[in-house]
Amino acid sequence: MTGLINPSGFVLACPGSGKSFLVKREIADVFLRNANADILVIDPEREYWKLAEAFNGTVVKFSNGSKSYINPFDFDIALLDDEEVDVIADKCQLITSFISCMDSKHPLNAQEKSFVDRCVRKAYIRSGVLDTLDPADMPTLETFLDCMKKETENINKDMKDKLIVTIDMYVNGSAKYFNNRTNIDTDNRFISYDIRDLNGNLKTQSMLLILDYIWNRLSRNRDLGRATYIYFDEAHLLFADEYALDYLRMLWKRARKYGGVLTGITQNVEDLLKDDKSRSMLSNSEYLALLKQNPTDAAKLQDILHFTDSEIQYVNDTPPGHGILVLGGKDKIPFYDEFPRDTELYSKITTNFSETAKMLEAKAE
């Protein structure tokens, strides 16, 4: 993929078609071949921990009861000197997306977005971090909530009270997990962010915050001359929310300049295709790995990607591991991923339940 103008892309497949195996095989290949690359995985289903541990990576588990935290307001101080980035504006967009995910059925209107934007900016000013440049002075959701409560200029009281009630749950209520300072270790070159134990909107919000946190890693790695490979499984969770999708698109556009390669992985192709923004991300991706698709999705993909009838057959009713690569938007390469099963690496990347059970049984003997 190094020869592609923008190597970010997608892995799309039905359940049981070899999607996770293909991705983990690629991760292993990147890790072993490129010592100057970091690998970061957002793992909603706890599928990557064995591979991470095999390579002495770090698995960071997020849940309501865990002690691993990411502060939504955190950012790399060095970004303040980056002329290509308005880090505070980006944070305003992130927090707007974060709040939108709290109730995706009722997106923020223009007045609410303006209010949130104003309070985010005031939270950074009030915390003092823009003067001290000390990460310990970063604002938190509690700082943000306090700014909301004290804001009185040109405010609709009903709107303000509604947002305060919503945010209060994330500061003092059941979702206060997000009202903490970042404390995770990110020095390892292979990190898997495990969010399986988070449910519903909390999972989507965590994916959003982790992507933003990874953006900080991208910034540091660019200065170090290191590549950053980012894999986010269950990508359709981000497509369901307009603001989360907008934030993802922003990262997608910037990643290449920072040495980043983003790979979205999903079995819900329909969610990817139903929105013009995500369809645009798909059609403009220079790397696509397609395995078995259901007939409806295959027909839609054929239309968007201009497959011939013979080319689309490589994803119609095919065995696991069979598919087609689309590189540079035009080159289509059929593949069959046949991996030797009597190896230690295979045991770390297979997701076949019966095979895993047999391996555990043999190990016990």
Segments from the language model and where they lie:
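C-terminal regions of RecA-like/P-loop NTPase motor modules
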Residues: C14-P15, L272-E365
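Charge-patterned, long linear interaction tracts outside catalytic cores
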Residues: L4-G9, A13, E26, V116-K149, ...
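Short acidic loop-to-helix transition motifs that present clustered carboxylates
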Residues: I5, R46, V269-L272, P295-T296
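H-loop/switch region of ABC-family ATPase nucleotide-binding domains
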Residues: T266
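Glycine-rich phosphate-binding loop of nucleotide-binding enzymes
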Residues: M1-N64
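P-loop NTPase motor domains
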Residues: T2, R46-T58, N64-S66, N71-G260, ...
